[in-house]
Design a protein with these regions (language model features):
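Conserved nucleotide- and phosphate/pyrophosphate-binding catalytic cores
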Residues: 71, 205, 211-377
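N-terminal Rossmann-like or analogous alpha/beta NTP/dinucleotide-binding catalytic cores
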Residues: 36, 40-187, 335, 339
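Intrinsic low-complexity, disordered N-terminal segments enriched in polar/charged/small residues
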Residues: 4-6
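Structured ligand/cofactor/substrate-binding pocket environments in proteins
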Residues: 69-78, 82, 91, 95-96, ...
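Short helix-capping/linker segments at secondary-structure and domain boundaries
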Residues: 152-158, 191-198, 298-306, 335
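Short, positively charged and aromatic/hydrophobic N-terminal segments
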Residues: 9, 15, 29-38
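Divalent metal-coordination and catalytic microenvironments
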Residues: 120, 148, 202, 294, ...
């Protein structure tokens, strides 16, 4: 995969100076020639930043490495990612650093990271049309997170709903990473100078905190980062098989779209439907039946199916069976692609490595600019 023209690489070293990690001057660069090297570095950084400005607006989204995604993940987020990759310069990151706040087994994290990468590609993300990489493969973001910590009041972080809820419900599993989670989120977005973030309206408060952190940094050190703007997506809230709560692996109410067909059938046949429809002859209420609602996404004839429920021409079992077969057929190509990718982890790792390398110049140029503004060079 050739790097995109808007992400032109720049030299990691100056014309005459010795370079250390992340392109920073080594201690030996203290002579007059070292000062010249520093000036060259500054010019190179400005050039890198200019060359990394995208021809199309740049969009960023982070994705938790939870393993194979379920139906709610696809309908609620992944389908939007696929659509956006042609409208924007799209950067998608599997956020394994974030996952460390709750996933503590190394092998589980490695496996779930690769599973999510394979699933995203199988479901339509094209590494030639977007950048897909793993968060920890660009460690510059952790440095920016620390620097953002120095401009972020603790009170902002303590008021976040996720932290407050976890502190009340699981006080023994609250760590510093959970508290500073929003700071790393802000760093994730702006280290690549992304100006847009795809979110549902319920996620607006999370993005607003990222914007506050960016404003705090820009106010103290000068205009450095764009304030990320939301791109509101039409993402449905997909209820789980219990019919009452949002589909979630932690609850165990999911439909695993990349699982084997028999597994999908079993999960769909277990779905709760209209609780007021007791007998086969009772009329149904498709507007409250989760099975009927899901038919909207897997066939243009859903209104006909709904009418069958209202008039009791169709039973709940029939409606479930039809939904199961449609979901199995819809995801069959993705299921095969997923299996092929998981059978060749070296190929999958190569795709992720190429994504991380593609955005390396942007991350390095951003950190050069940030260090200079903060007096660290």
């Amino acid at each position: 995969m050739a790097p995109q023209p808007t992400m032109t690489d720049v030299g990691a070293s100056s014309a005459n100076g010795t370079r250390g990690a992340a392109g920073r001057p080594c201690p030996a660069d203290l002579s007059p020639s070292g000062k010249l090297d520093a000036m060259t570095d500054a010019a190179a950084a400005k050039s890198a930043i200019a060359s990394s400005l995208p021809a199309k607006p740049r969009i960023f989204s982070g994705i938790q490495p939870t393993g194979r995604p379920h139906l709610g993940n696809d309908l609620g987020a992944i389908r939007n990612y696929v659509a956006l990759q042609d409208q924007y310069e799209s950067i998608y990151c599997i956020v394994d650093y974030h996952a460390l706040t709750h996933v503590h087994d190394p092998e589980t994290l490695r496996r779930q990271t690769l599973e999510m990468a394979a699933a995203l590609i199988a479901l339509g993300l094209d590494p030639e049309r977007c950048t897909l990489f793993v968060q920890s493969d660009r460690p510059e973001v952790t440095e920016l997170c620390w620097l953002f910590n120095t401009v972020t009041p603790v009170g902002w972080l303590q008021r976040t709903p996720t932290f407050k809820e976890k502190r009340q419900t699981q006080p023994d599993d609250v760590n510093h990473g959970l508290l500073t989670y929003p700071v790393l989120q802000a760093a994730d977005i702006v280290i690549y100078k992304a100006s847009l973030v795809p979110i549902g309206k319920d996620q607006a408060p999370h993005l607003e905190l990222s914007r506050e952190i960016v404003r705090a940094f820009n106010s103290r050190y000068g205009e450095t980062f764009p304030e990320p703007q939301p791109v509101y997506t039409q993402a449905p809230v997909v209820l789980g098989t219990d019919g009452t709560r949002k589909m979630s692996k932690s609850i165990g109410n999911t439909i695993e779209v990349l699982a084997e067909p028999d597994v999908i059938r079993k999960q769909i046949m277990s779905m709760v439907t209209d609780t007021q429809r007791i007998l086969r002859s009772d009329p149904g209420r498709p507007q409250v039946c989760n099975v009927c609602q899901l038919h909207r996404h897997f066939g243009e004839d859903y209104e006909e199916i709904w009418d069958g429920e209202r008039t009791a021409r169709t039973g709940c079992v029939d409606t479930k069976k039809l939904l199961a077969e449609r979901i199995i057929a819809h995801y069959a190509p993705a299921r095969e692609t997923y299996k092929e990718l998981m059978a060749d982890p070296a190929r999958l790792r190569r795709i992720l490595d190429e994504g991380a390398e593609r955005i390396r110049p942007i991350a390095e140029a951003t950190m050069t600019e940030v260090r200079e503004r903060m007096g660290l060079r």
